[in-house]
UniProtKB/Swiss-Prot annotation:
Compositionally biased spans, kind Basic and acidic residues: 17-34
Name of the molecule in the record: UPF0337 protein mlr2098
Similarity comment: family membership: Belongs to the UPF0337 (CsbD) family.
Gene3D superfamilies membership: YjbJ
InterPro entries in UniProt: CsbD (IPR008462), YjbJ_sf (IPR036629)
């Protein structure tokens, strides 16, 4: 996945996870609450991966630009 895809998937998983967790708490369903918490955590990790990919890409582009400028 690209950084944008990772970020979007991460945000979606966070949102769905929060919703599941909230519904699970509201209806007293511990399994649904736990699934929601796990999905939210997965989303946070996906988003962090996307952020890291973006940072690496930006650093690579800056390095390439600096090298090309000095050639």
């Amino acid at each position: 996945m690209g950084s944008t895809s990772d970020k979007a998937s991460g945000l979606a998983n966070e949102a769905v996870g929060k919703a599941k967790e909230g519904v699970g708490k509201a209806v007293g369903n511990d399994r649904l609450r736990a699934e929601g918490a796990a999905q939210e955590a997965k989303g946070k990790v996906q988003k962090a991966v996307g952020d890291a990919k973006s940072a690496v890409k930006d650093a690579t582009n800056k390095t390439a630009a600096a090298i090309n400028k000095n050639l």
